[in-house]
Amino acid sequence: MTERSPSAIQPKRVVVTGIGAISSLAPTAAETWASIVAGGTGIRRADDLDPAEHPCLLRGEVDRAGLPQRFLQGKAARNTSLFSKMALESAGEAMIDAGLLDADLQPVVDLTDAGAAFGTCIGGTYDDLLPAHETFLKRGTSRVPPHLHVMFPHNLAAYTVQHRFGMGGPSSTVATACATGAQAIGDGFHAIKFGLAPLMIAGATESTAHPLFQAGFSAMRALVTDSNDNPDAASRPFDATRAGFVLGEGSGMVVLEDLDHARARGARILAEVLGYATSNDAYHPIAPQPDGEGAARAIRAALADAAIAPEQIEHISAHAASTQAGDVAEAKAIHMVFGDRAKSIPVTSIKGAIGHCMAAAGALETIVAIKTLVEGRIPPTRNYNNPDPEVNLDIVGNTARDADISIMTKHSFGLGGQNACLVLAKYGES
């Protein structure tokens, strides 16, 4: 592997050359985007939730039976956790999109120095560890699966992808709650910017469809409980009647490249990552900082990293999970950073379509943001019908809006006061 020292190089320009996604809407990025722009929803009533036990019966659940199986079959697939399989399939889709794989799904370029910056908060805890624990209690030590400890750990998604494609470069896995996806992409961006790798697969994956996980958020009173008979209207980001979020799941991956590396292989360039930063509220493990100051710090720092002035931002892809406190705190952060312009910058949240995908949320939303730059369309915020005076922003509600966006931000915020912000741009030669 080529040794690189961050202090010995000039910062690199970092571009996006491929995207891949699995969501409750569809098993590909293109289909997910098309459905979101058309106002679709992947939120449904879940089959495994007992109405007597669960006040929220809804989920944005991935169609497990319809998942692609292009890169892993047989015993290897059986011994790989769902979160890792989703990561592999969406990473593979992104690599195909980037022109990195041939017809046999093998790399067409040397990926020895390429790396992975991934994230997940749950890993295989519910899909693998809990069932193994039940087996252990009922049938004893001898019946515990021998492959258990190479299934549920968080870092196995990155390993699965790097092993499949021979990627021997940097490898990291972050778990920063709902900011994870944006932070993983930001970490991949910085790895390339500072010369640690020429190419990174970056994103996050999350499998949340388990009654215990649902129960935990119900106990926190974070989930919407007024829409069990009307799933389409359950998640209402920024709307004055919002009453909690809906759990979602999925995986989103992007191919990030050093611009020179992408040009040398003749890659199609989708967008450019200009900046990234993270911060912490240092306020409360669950509640956001009410005045939005912690989130504003991340946004300001990302703009500084990008050498971009607030006046240059033309669109905001919001976190907005459809909670009363969180959506207002985010709006206050936006007003704090952008001042009088805040009310005229188009803002959208896609959680009304796919729910809150936890670690994968920021990654899937970044992919939609990239498509916004490429296609010139801002996707709608589903169920935005009643403006909240405490929000006071230009929310793109219910219908997609045509807009030629040059530079935008993508925000993600999470439990533990985690904040992350990416600055994304339409690619230009200069």
Where are these regions (language model features)?
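Conserved beta-ketoacyl condensing-enzyme motif
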Residues: 16, 40-176, 205-214, 310-326
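Active-site-proximal alpha-helical scaffold in enzymes
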Residues: 87-100, 154-157, 162-165, 171-206, ...
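ACP-dependent fatty acid/polyketide chain-elongation machinery
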Residues: 1-76, 98, 260-272, 367-381, ...
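Acyl-CoA/ACP chain-elongation machinery
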Residues: 47, 196-243, 276-290, 320-327, ...
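Conserved small-residue
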Residues: 18, 36, 91, 116, ...
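Short, well-ordered amphipathic alpha-helical segments that serve as non-catalytic structural scaffolds
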Residues: 86-99, 157, 257-259, 292-307, ...
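Glycine-/small-residue-rich "gating" segment that lines the acyl/pantetheine channel
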Residues: 137-145, 186, 190, 194, ...
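Condensing-enzyme catalytic core mediating Claisen C-C bond formation in acyl metabolism
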Residues: 13-17, 40-45, 230-306, 314-315, ...
